[in-house]
Amino acid sequence: MSVTTWNLNGTKHHVLICNGSSCMRKGGEEATQAIRNKVAELNLDEAVHTTRTCNGRCKDAPVAIVYPSGDWYKQVTEKVAHRIVEEHLAGGCSLKESLIYEYDQKGFVSPENSDSIEGIDKVKSNA
């Protein structure tokens, strides 16, 4: 079995695209292909690396996370996927209306007026 090891020197963005079962039922494969195809179309292959994974936000499926900015996008349709590549990765502007979380140097925060669910706390109380 061959294992791929990418040389990521010079990579500017890493996009984690959710391909867990909930996301796949809600268009995760289409979102993945839309992002990858638009990256190729705009000749951004050397600047953008994509990874299929599970991001643990099933209620917001499908989800894509862009680093290094730390922006989490919800309900990524093919149209939103194209906009992520064109406006965020190529243009440097987040899609505020599609954000679940953004990073503010103190940690992840939900944008104002977000309609996304809060989710389960990662730290369990000792109650």
UniProtKB/Swiss-Prot annotation:
The keyword Electron transport applies. One of its GO terms (molecular function) is 2 iron, 2 sulfur cluster binding. Pfam families: 2Fe-2S_thioredx. SUPFAM superfamilies: Thioredoxin-like (SSF52833). InterPro entries: Thioredoxin-like_sf (IPR036249). Its cofactor is [2Fe-2S] cluster. Keywords: 2Fe-2S, Electron transport, Iron, Iron-sulfur, Metal-binding, Transport. [2Fe-2S] cluster binds at C23, C54, C58. Binds 1 [2Fe-2S] cluster. Belongs to the 2Fe2S Shethna-type ferredoxin family. Ferredoxins are iron-sulfur proteins that transfer electrons in a wide variety of metabolic reactions. This is Putative 2Fe-2S ferredoxin. The gene is cbiW.
